[in-house]
Each structure stands twice: as structure tokens, then as C-alpha cells.
């Protein structure tokens, strides 16, 4: 798997990451969601470089022209609920893409162990298509893998490109091992620590709660 980490190079993306991590800016949930969307634009742009293109003839008001346009059938897939703002940002770039949604979540058992469950899986036929799998936080990588395995019920994609905002080093290593070799991970930042509760450190906290409020 090819891994691309965007904040290794300076760009305005790093300013959005700083706001996402900042405990004071996080108090504005609308701004937090918007910053996730903005990061999605960058991830989608980088993903577009891995796609196939074909020549398209277009007519301008003055003459004819040719442009290379995406020829792959693209499906934007997200892991609910935290994945929605990222999904929206990616969809703003790939605005003709199909859409898929999976609910993958973790349950903490009384003994401290984690259990991951899938309860919702809605997708078009994925056979031979390029799937952009969106989840803002790549912690252990288990929910990402479960989402991918659930989506395989709808056909085998030609390629999977994972798009994430922040991940742990352990999570990156996990998906690198478990996903097909022609997959790609494009991620804005990778943090060094995954704590005993499987939270990314320094991370940014619970992305779903910061987007949509706490849950019982």
C-alpha cells in the first residue's frame, strides 16, 4: 500500500489541522465540521492524481478544446457518523460520484476490551470501481477494515483509496497490512501514540462528538 502524509509539506492544510486540534476552536462545532470538509478537498485532490483519465472534447464560445477528464467510476464511501463532513468535502470535488455508507462503531466492554460492529451497509454495485473510503480518524484501523469488508458484499472494487484526517502510526501499519496491495492511504497527519483506550494522541478528541454533539 502506498501511504501519503500531507502535512509533511507545508500548505494551508496545516492551518486547518491546527484549528481542528485546538480545544478552543473546537467549541464551534460548525467550524469544526467545515474544517473537516476543507481537509476533504485536499484529500480528494490528491486522490484524483491516482485515477485514470481520458480525453474529452469540449466546445468553448470561441473554438474547440480537449481536456483530460476522470474516466474511473468513483464511489465515495464513509463510515458513519464522524465520516459525514469528510464525505461532503470529498463529494464537493467528485460531484458526480456515487455514494456508499457504513456504520462501523466500537463498544468498550466492562473488561476494557473493544468490540467493533457493523449495523448499516448501503452502497451501489462496487465491482470494478474506485472507492474513496472516508473516515476522519484512523485509530486502530479495525473499523476501517470492517467497513471495507462490509462493502465487499456489493462487489470487488478496482482500487480502494483511504482518506483520513488524522491517524495513529499503529493504525497506518494495520491498514497497510490488511488492505489489498494496490490500495492507497492519503492522510493529513499521523500521530505517534495510540493510548490504552485506543484514542490517537495528541489527536483531536472524538471527531463524531465534536461534529454533532455527545451521545449517551
Region locations from a protein language model:
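PRPP-associated nucleotide enzymes
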Residues: 1-216
